[in-house]
Amino acid sequence: VSIVTKANIMKKTDGDFLQICREVAEEYPEIETDNWFVDIMAANLVNKDIRNQFQVFLLPNLYGDIITDEAAQIQGGVGTAGSANIGRDYALFEAIHGSAPRMVEEGIEGYANPASLMKAAAMMLAHIGYVEKAERLEKALDAADAKLGPKMTGLPGGGTCREFADEVLAAL
């Protein structure tokens, strides 16, 4: 687990966050933790030689929004990334970019890339114990992305939501 802050500058807010993370980490000695400044982590993520060494990030919302969008861009863009918020009693799965109401306002909702919501659905399936079905959906998404990914621009002339969904269904 990599704890990401700017505790060297934001001494109170991020400093407290880092301290609490360290205290909680002591309760779980079997889980390896380290901590990074958000600017260094941003640089690490664009370095293809080291970005794969990171597995789980623990960070405040502001940095989470930035780092997750950066990571999403590396793997295809925010239109392709799912999101999970998992607590003790409840879990919420959604597209990382939200609902994109702008596309409806502009009349281009048919060009929305459904991959992020489908990835969130795969995460949800795994979370509730349907790991095999989640893996099948992930593979179908990869197949659809390999075929249509470059066409999925979110703009007229690009691939449509229906085309992408049809490719996922065909792969399933």
Predicted features along the sequence, with ranges:
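A glycine- and small/hydrophobic-rich beta-loop-beta segment
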Residues: 33, 38-54, 171
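Glycine-rich phosphate/nucleotide-binding loop
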Residues: 45-148
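A short beta-alpha structural unit
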Residues: 7-9, 40-46, 122
